Structure formats: C-alpha cells, structure tokens
Amino acid sequence: MALSRGLPRELAEAVSGGRVLVVGAGGIGCELLKNLVLTGFSHIDLIDLDTIDVSNLNRQFLFQKKHVGRSKAQVAKESVLQFHPQANIEAHHDSIMNPDYNVEFFRQFILVMNALDNRAARNHVNRMCLAADVPLIESGTAGYLGQVTTIKKGVTECYECHPKPTQRTFPGCTIRNTPSEPIHCIVWAKYLFNQLFGEEDADQEVSPDRADPEAAWEPTEAEARARASNEDGDIKRISTKEWAKSTGYDPVKLFTKLFKDDIRYLLTMDKLWRKRKPPVPLDWAEVQSQGEANADQQNEPQLGLKDQQVLDVKSYASLFSKSIETLRVHLAEKGDGAELIWDKDDPPAMDFVTSAANLRMHIFSMNMKSRFDIKSMAGNIIPAIATTNAVIAGLIVLEGLKILSGKIDQCRTIFLNKQPNPRKKLLVPCALDPPNTNCYVCASKPEVTVRLNVHKVTVLTLQDKIVKEKFAMVAPDVQIEDGKGTILISSEEGETEANNPKKLSDFGIRNGSRLQADDFLQDYTLLINILHSEDLGKDVEFEVVGDSPEKVGPKQAEDAAKSIANGSDDGAQPSTSTAQEQDDVLIVDSDEEGPSNSTDCSGDDKARKRKLEENEAASTKKCRLEQMEDPDDVIALD
C-alpha cells in the first residue's frame, strides 16, 4: 500500500500526480524505484543503457537469474509493478546522453534522481537539469560509504562547482619497462589482452619501450639481445595480434616472448636497473621442472576460497596457457576480423589477466595476488553492499519529499559513514552550499581560462581532451571570437574534420584569444580564454587556471595509491554513456561512483564532498550547520 495516504494533501497530490525521472537502474536504482512506488509515485520514467549480468544479482534485487541479458530498465519496470500495479512507469533502454533526451524532455519532470555509476553521465544530467531548471538529487555509494545531495539552479552548488580529484594515471614507460606495484602489472596484462585478442591501440603497447628517457644501454649489446628477442617474430614490424596469429597463438612461444625474451631485452637498458632490482626472466622449461620439484608442496591443501588463493608460478603458467587456448577458440568462432572485449566477469578473460599479471609480478619481485584481488583492481571494484544502497535510496526519497513540499531550504547533503563520528552519528547532514560564482557550468556567464601551448596543441586535442573530456560537452561547436566567427569545431560530422590535425596557432589563436564553445543539446555556452605557455610540465598538455593540472602530481599519486579502488568515475563502459578513449593510462571503473568520506563537513573544504579516501578517522571540525535538533533522518548511535 502506498505511503502517500499518510502525507499532507498537497504533497500527496504532487507525489501521485507528478512525473519524476530516475537515471540508472543498478544498485541504487533498484532500491530507489521500489521506494518510489511504495511511497506513492505513480508517474516514473526510468532510463538505463545496461543489460543484466550475473554479477548484478547479489544486490540488484529486482533482477533474477532468468533476466540475465535483458534490459535493466525494462525488467526493473516489470518487477516493481508487482509492488504497485497501477503505477505508470516508462522504461527507456537507452543512454541519457542521447540527443533525444533534450532540455524539453527534462522539463516534463518535477524531479530528477541520479543513480549513476560514472562522471560523464553525471555531468551531463547536471547540465540538463540546470538548463531545464528542474531539481536534481545526486547520490553515490562505495562500499560502506554513501552520499546524497540536492542540486537546484541558483540555490545550491551544482555537481561541477568544484574540481573532482584527478584520476590516477600511469606513464606508458612505467607499465612497459619498470613496474613497481601490482597494479602496473595488472594494467599491462589488460593491455596485453587487447593487443592479442581485442582492439589494438598503439597507446597500449606492451613490449619494452625503447624511447624511455631513463633507459641507456650499450648499442652493440642491445642489438644482440634484440636479435635474440626477434627470432620468433618482431612485434615492432607487425602488430602483436598478427605475430600471435602467425604462431597459431602458441602459448609456449607467447610465454617465451613476453616473459623471457622481452625481459632479457629490458635488462640491456642498464640505466634502468642502477637503483632498481632487475627483473628475472622466466623460462618455460625451467618453470615446468621447478613445478615438478615442488610437487609435494603443491599438493598441500590451501585454505580459503579458490579465488582467494595465491598459486605458484607453474600453476599460473599453466593457467596462462589454458586461457590463451580458450580465447583463441572464442576469437576463431567469431570469424575473421573479430575482436574480443575484456570483461572482468568473463572467466577466460579473467584467467588470462590473472595469470599474465602474476607472472609479471613474479619477474619483478612483487608478491603475487589472488584472482579475487586482481579482479577487484582490474575492474576497480569496491565490493558493493546492498544495505548501503538501500540506505542511500531511502535518503533520496526523503530529500525528494522535502523538495516537493516546497521546503528545499531543509534539504541537506547527507553522508553515510562506515563508523559513527565523535558525536555518534552514522549519518551526517551538512547544509547545502550556494552556487560557486566561479563555476564554469552554473555561473551566469560561464568562463574559464586554459593554459596551453598554441604551437603544440591540435584542434583534435582541443575537441576531445579539453572541450569534451575536461568540460564534458557532448556535441560541441567551437568558434574563434576573432570578429569573423571562424568555426574551429563543428558538431556536424565531417564538417571540420580537416581542422583536426592542425595546431591552434595555424588559425591565428595566440595568448589572449577567446573561444566560444556551445553545446546545443545541453543548452550550454562556455567562453574559453587561451593563455599561451611554453613552460608546461612534462606530459602536461593543458591546465585549467585555478584548477588542478591535467596530470597526477606526487601527492595525488600517493593518495591514489592508497585508494586505487575508490578513485573512479567515467572510464568504464558506463550504463548510460559511451566508453571513454584510453591513453597510456589506467582507466578504472566502479559499480557506483564513490561519495565523499566525511564524518563531518566544513564549508572551507568543499572538496570533501567529492573525494573518497580510505582514512575514516573522525574529524574534529564542526559541521557548517546552525545549531539545531537532530533531523529525523539522522541516526544517533548511543
């Protein structure tokens, strides 16, 4: 029975008669949809691009095994109608970033609720709600942590009012030449999967990087080693996949190439090993014989679940061989020109990455990892907890009822913590912050300054990495404010493609130039001021003035290393947006984007609302709230 009967009359009418939008039908989305219909919401639109996977079933309770492979949105609708058969639910198996879902679409709703798992889609929905002037409730969970906040144009800060932590990245030379952490080997193994079975990407090369600036070697010795490495085929002359095909995907030849010959070649780069422990090549025959010598030890029973056991080198070599054979068969079944896509839930693909990563860890003297640990790191999986999703979904509805009651001033940003804070609160409410006057999204006249080298940055970089990736536009049009309205980038396919390889300076862009970027879909215009600089750091293509540089600094890298599983957003193949392009970096993905880890809140440190850290020590700072009685939706633990 719907709870709306117990609500005040005006609120009950808004609940039963108003139309709301739920974006995402995953962990939070399933709980939220159930809560909405039980509260009495009768007109709900639900959108999600994902299909149901077996791994979803432990927490996304609207789905059953028989639903695997079907649309999440459609099945969620069918399941939740059993709670409220009279509800009018419209399911959309689509991306929220589809141009069909324009500003007019968003204006149909009295409230939008996000249950997303990636930053790109969050940014987009944030802008659409600002353009349509519709309240948005944003949410996220990560393990035991959760967060809910309200966004209203002109009243509160928007999702993009403050820079998000820069995603952790790894230089290509570290991945290929000098891995020092298990995650480096896991990234290398994922790259190797794509090089052998998937879509090849030059930025995901796995062979030794001869251009590494740290490397130095004797040319004659290197040439001799290179000859030995190339006896089975030079992967620099032909693609890795073509070379592997020419060997018939022979596991022993692949093993020898990757774990012996390439490692021997790395050893010729003597400068790399002056302050590092050098890697130790693996020989297939020796690995097999060592395994026989240790047979008695191998037969000893291991404690724990199979996926949580760390095997020996011989076992991983065998797993490597078996997984290659299985993947070779799968690739052949798909036909010529086919590609496989790495999926953490595909056993052969996971076997391949587990074995390859562990063999490389052993070579570089690291402790090997269990399949469970590697799966968590490879997919950046924070174990999802159903009760966390349930708590956050409940809070979303409570905040929604405040909005529909016309009491948005009573809305709060609410943090769910793993442990109670010093005031014994597990749920901590913080006052909503006003809009950031310098925000390049919700300010009255959005404007930003970008520092770059106009003689090096191309139009394609401006389009893909700055306008689309950094400023989250979907279909941008960019013109130069030069009095002539020169079109630099057009959203019409092919119209300005010839401009892509040209440098910005080729169009007269210099220090002080101004670009106007428009996204018709998002009803969003951004003025970009160009600040020319030739003093940018190594590998830094651009910086947003007042923002963090587009590179992981030492402190950021240190923080990320502490919480590699928690720093993700838009790099996955999200449920509501397209997959992002990958450079020579680790792109990590998570089930639900992580919320802030905040046991208290401070107005001076707004970044706490976005950043998730592992250290959950309670802060002594007071919440920026007036002294008041505990709200009803705050749990006090005595």
From Swiss-Prot:
Keywords: Acetylation, ATP-binding, Cytoplasm, Isopeptide bond, Metal-binding, Nucleotide-binding, Nucleus, Phosphoprotein, Transferase, Ubl conjugation, Ubl conjugation pathway, Zinc. The active site is at C173 (glycyl thioester intermediate). GO terms for cellular component: cytoplasm; nucleolus; nucleoplasm; SUMO activating enzyme complex. Residues 581-594, 628-638 have a biased composition (Acidic residues). There is a cross-link at K190, K257, K271, K275, K609, K611, K621 (Glycyl lysine isopeptide (Lys-Gly) (interchain with G-Cter in SUMO)). One of its GO terms (biological process) is protein sumoylation. InterPro entries: ThiF/MoeB/HesA, ThiF_NAD_FAD-bd, UAE_UbL_dom, Ub-E1_IAD_1, Ub_act_enz_dom_a_sf, Uba2, UBA2_C, Ubiquitin-activating_enz. The modification Phosphoserine is found at S207, S505, S548, S590. GO terms for molecular function: ATP binding; magnesium ion binding; protein heterodimerization activity; small protein activating enzyme binding; SUMO activating enzyme activity; SUMO binding; transferase activity; ubiquitin-like protein conjugating enzyme binding. Pathway: Protein modification; protein sumoylation. Residues 222-233, 548-561, 603-614 have a biased composition (Basic and acidic residues). Residues 202-233, 548-638 are annotated as: Disordered. There is a cross-link at K236, K257, K369, K418, K538 (Glycyl lysine isopeptide (Lys-Gly) (interchain with G-Cter in SUMO2)). ATP binds at residues 24-29, 48, 56-59, 72, 95-96, 117-122. It holds the Pfam family ThiF. Belongs to the ubiquitin-activating E1 family. Heterodimer of SAE1 and UBA2/SAE2. The heterodimer corresponds to the two domains that are encoded on a single polypeptide chain in ubiquitin-activating enzyme E1. Interacts with UBE2I. This is SUMO-activating enzyme subunit 2. It comes from Mus musculus (Mouse).
